[in-house]
A protein has these predicted regions:
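Short acidic/polar hinge/loop motifs at secondary-structure boundaries
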Residues: 114-141
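Outer-membrane beta-barrel signature, preferentially recognizing the C-terminal barrel domain
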Residues: 107, 252-275, 311, 366-368, ...
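Short strand-turn segments of transmembrane beta-barrel domains in outer membranes
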Residues: 156, 161-191, 202, 207-214
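Structural signature of Gram-negative outer-membrane beta-barrels, strongest in the C-terminal barrel
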Residues: 230, 327-331, 357-475, 508-512, ...
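Extracytoplasmic beta-strand/coil segments of soluble accessory domains associated
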Residues: 66-114
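Short, acidic, small-residue-rich periplasmic hinge/interaction motif at the N-terminus
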Residues: 21-57, 65, 465
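Gram-negative outer-membrane beta-barrel transporters
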Residues: 380-383, 472-474, 491-563, 587-593, ...
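Flexible loop and strand-edge segments within Gram-negative outer membrane beta-barrel domains
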Residues: 207-214, 218, 232-315
Length: 627
């Protein structure tokens, strides 16, 4: 281990030793992730991090992902530029949790509890997750397949959308500009009048980025309408649409010419919810869809490609749950889900637009269905002891049925602290690409399966809160592309055995100063996973004085695996690097705020995706207006 991780841990230990004697009950967070009803985290056996809107907006980032990467131990998000992640070859935005990869569909992103992933490739589309829609983000570390099913194998990121709680009208406008021709802007309006509330927002951003032919442009909007029929019943409908255009230059040593992407993603959902003293529940319908058009480019600038890759996909479903307190200390949740997953991948001629006939499974269409039922029961046996158990039966139209159990216990030896133990199973059904698309595809694939064993401790004091997690992951049936005879084939031949530790702490020194830090240590016994660092540490400081707010964060990455061949195997390792980011906000008055951000202020030379060196120091500045 290098000296800088040790120094960051020493600072954490010194803070805990100095301030642990100040014991008082802090305001506890309530969450909806990992449990369908609103629940105090002290009674849940799993670990959930909450990143609120103030944290999401203090650095004026357009995406939620850079912020949650800093705030959540064990989470890594890949990047290749100042703005934009892109899709297809060379894309960034891959999300890793404890060495379990969202790029392989093993980590699930939700919007208001509804799954979001590409119906062809099974992975999240990271450019879709914009800050303007989010009231808060809840991140569950570890499997959550009992509640959410397939893909919630390594963890869950749940984006809880914004809503207005008090009567009134609020309008926010934010604009900014900075390095490499980067321009960002967004506007939102929230209204509540009696039983009706609404939220409408729009966003635009563009940049040239730091390499030639790496431009990125994005625009989109979000709409949410809600109505409270009675104090106990309400309904809402929301929609989110985003479109981005991206250019792709290839690796720095292997340039690609003419590569471009035109991507549209959308989400629509509607729900009816009930909330009584002893029971609460919801019935919702949802769909997320995509339209992709991609020019893969050419290694020879004089020989442009003659076709576009295109895809259409949709994930449409119905979700129902009802949670009830049957007697003192009890909570029973019953639920059922149905999902229809559609994917269509094909090529068209650039000149005529005609659909092309392609050999070797280069094109394909797939329809898959999943239906599931589940229950989760939580019981306080005594005031200091809670037991939790859940079970899901999930049936896939191709791979068959899968039983998913979880068990947990929470012991509260102090009114301000709890020990949690959790054993849970996660799984992932194979994607359309793995079963039907390209020569290695295999229609006989089975679900990937994973068991997670976890022990954690949380303690909340007057000004200090801290926690620690130990985990062990044992996964099998991992889908790998394997050499079989003279060709390659996707097989359930892989295994993952990861274990590690995570530490986190927050200390509010006084009204002006606050510190937060988190650290994760990961050991991968089988092989190193791409973009899963062996150590990730973060130390942040917030300073507020009158109208001035300053936020600074120092992130240290060690043992980051890189894939130099494109086969998904970490065959190289990036040297350790330290990133210093800072944001400054100055409130001129109650309406206008001036802001400035700096990233990689130490001008580090590093890469997260092999062949895509990151920019050195970059800057943004702008203004926020609140009416």
């Amino acid at each position: 281990m290098r000296i800088r991780p040790l120094l960051m841990l020493a600072a954490l230990a010194a803070s805990i030793a100095a301030f642990a004697q100040k014991d008082s009950v802090a305001l506890d967070e309530v969450v909806v992730t990992g449990t369908r009803n609103v629940t105090d985290v002290r009674y849940l056996p799993m670990t959930v991090n909450v990143i609120n809107r103030e944290q999401l907006t203090q650095n004026n980032a357009t995406s939620i992902l850079p912020t949650i990467m800093q705030q959540v131990p064990g989470m890594m998000v890949t990047s290749r530029s100042m703005l934009g992640y892109g899709v297809s070859t060379g894309a960034a935005g891959g999300i890793n949790m404890r060495g379990i990869s969202g790029g392989a569909g093993q980590l699930l992103v939700l919007i208001d509890g509804h799954p979001q992933y590409n119906g062809v490739y099974g992975h999240p589309i990271s450019d879709s997750y914009q800050t303007l829609m989010a009231e808060r983000v809840e991140v569950l570390r570890g499997p959550a397949s009992v509640i959410y099913g397939s893909n919630a194998m390594g963890g869950v990121i749940n984006i809880v959308t914004r809503k207005m709680l008090q009567d009134g009208v609020r309008t926010n406008v934010r604009v900014g500009a900075g390095s490499y021709g980067t321009v960002t802007g967004e506007a939102s309006n929230t209204v509540r009048k009696g039983k009706f509330s609404s939220m409408v927002a729009g966003q635009y951003s563009r940049t040239d980025n730091h390499r030639p032919n790496m431009g990125f442009e994005q625009y989109g909007g979000h709409l949410k309408l809600a109505y409270d029929f009675t104090p106990h019943w309400n309904a809402y409908i929301d929609a989110d649409i985003t479109h981005f255009n991206a250019s792709y230059p290839g690796q720095d040593v292997k340039p690609v010419y003419g590569a471009r992407q035109w991507i549209t993603r959308g989400v629509v959902s509607a729900a009816v919810e009930n909330n009584y003293e002893r029971t609460s529940g919801a019935l919702s319908i949802f769909t997320n869809f995509g339209r992709h058009k991609i020019d893969d480019g050419s290694a020879d600038a004089t020989k442009p490609t003659s076709r576009y890759f295109r895809s259409k996909d949709a994930l449409t479903g119905i979700s129902w749950y009802q949670s009830a307190r049957l007697f003192e200390g009890n909570r029973l949740t019953l639920g059922a889900d149905y999902q229809h997953i559609y994917g269509n991948a094909y090529y068209t001629d650039k000149t005529t637009g005609d659909i092309l006939v392609t050999p070797n499974k280069q094109s394909g269409r797939s329809y898959r269905n999943e239906v599931a039922g589940y229950f989760d029961v939580r019981q306080d046996l005594v005031g200091w002891l809670t037991l939790d158990a859940g079970l899901r039966l999930d049936h896939h139209s191709i791979t068959g049925s899968e039983w998913i159990p979880q068990f947990g216990v929470v012991v509260r030896p102090l009114s301000t602290g709890e020990v949690k133990a959790m054993v849970s199973k996660g799984f992932r059904n194979p994607t359309m690409r793995e079963m039907f698309l390209y020569p290695p595809s295999n229609e006989e694939l089975k679900p990937e399966r994973m068991w997670n064993y976890e022990l954690s401790w949380r303690h909340r004091l007057q000004k200090l809160s801290y926690g620690a997690n130990l985990f062990y992951i044992d996964a099998d049936n991992i889908i790998l592309t394997t050499q079989v005879g003279s060709g390659k084939k996707n097989l359930n031949s892989g295994r993952i055995r990861n274990y590690g530790a995570e530490l986190e702490a927050t200390y509010h020194i006084n009204d002006m100063w606050a510190l937060n830090t988190n650290h994760s240590f990961l050991k991968m016994k089988k092989q190193q996973v791409v973009a899963a660092p062996k150590y990730k540490g973060f130390l942040g400081a917030d300073f507020r004085l009158h109208r001035l707010a300053v936020n600074a964060g120092l992130q240290y990455i060690s043992g980051l695996g890189l894939d130099s061949t494109g086969d998904g195997i970490a065959d190289k390792q990036e040297k350790d690097f330290v990133l210093l980011n800072m944001s400054v906000n100055y409130h001129l008055n109650n309406i206008v705020t001036l802001w400035a951000n700096g990233e990689n202020l130490l001008a580090q030379r590093y890469q997260i995706n092999y062949g895509y060196p990151m920019p050195r120091a970059t800057f943004m500045a702008g203004v926020n207006v609140k009416l």
